Amino acid sequence: MTPHEPTPDPDMRHAGAVEPSPWVVRFAPLAPSGGTVLDLACGTGRHGRHFLARGHNVVFLDRDVSLVADLAGDARAEIVAADLETGEGLPLGTRRFAGIVVTNYLWRPLLPALAAALGRDGVLIYETFGRGNEAYSRPRNPDHLLRPGELFAAFGGALQVVAYECGLRHDPKPRIIQRIAAVNSDAPAPLAPE
């Protein structure tokens, strides 16, 4: 186990969410080498830890950063405690990122700011729950569930979409998800391995 691999924690908010999402792992290589990655609403930091292991600097941002406190001594990890839902937008000024990762989180007013915070050739990797998920598990509140095609519509005009999916997944349990990988580039993006 490397120093940046997450360790199981029985008090985790997202039980069983120790390993990075396969969607994030698949598209992580699209983040330009040496650039800083933003793990937004990072929770345990499982995705940011993956990018640390890939050699990136990472900004871990969440309202409660206690689950990434073990990274406080790492010079490549910046920990930012902020409530993203106060209406102030991203608390990161004009910074641009080589990658932005968001999973299992939706605050619609932030979507335009995410595209604006992505640096040239940077990659946005976003995966969260969609409408219909309420039939299987939480979240059930429509405010926390993407409408069909919403993620594509939010980023398809500003970024080059490399991959998009919306539908029912059965692993590890049934859920409706939407996910997108998109780059801030006019040039054709290399396709990630399947």
What are these regions (language model features)?
Residues 1-32:
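S-adenosyl-L-methionine
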Residues 143-158:
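Short alpha-helix
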Residues 34-43:
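Conserved class I S-adenosyl-L-methionine
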Residues 122-133:
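Conserved beta-strand signature within the Rossmann-like core of class I S-adenosyl-L-methionine
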Residues 90-99:
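A short acidic, Gly/Pro-enriched loop at the edge of an enzyme's catalytic core
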Residues 45-87:
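Class I SAM-dependent methyltransferase SAM/SAH-binding core
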Residues 106-118:
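A short, conserved alpha-helix within the catalytic core of class I
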Residues 169-194:
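Core SAM-dependent methyltransferase catalytic element
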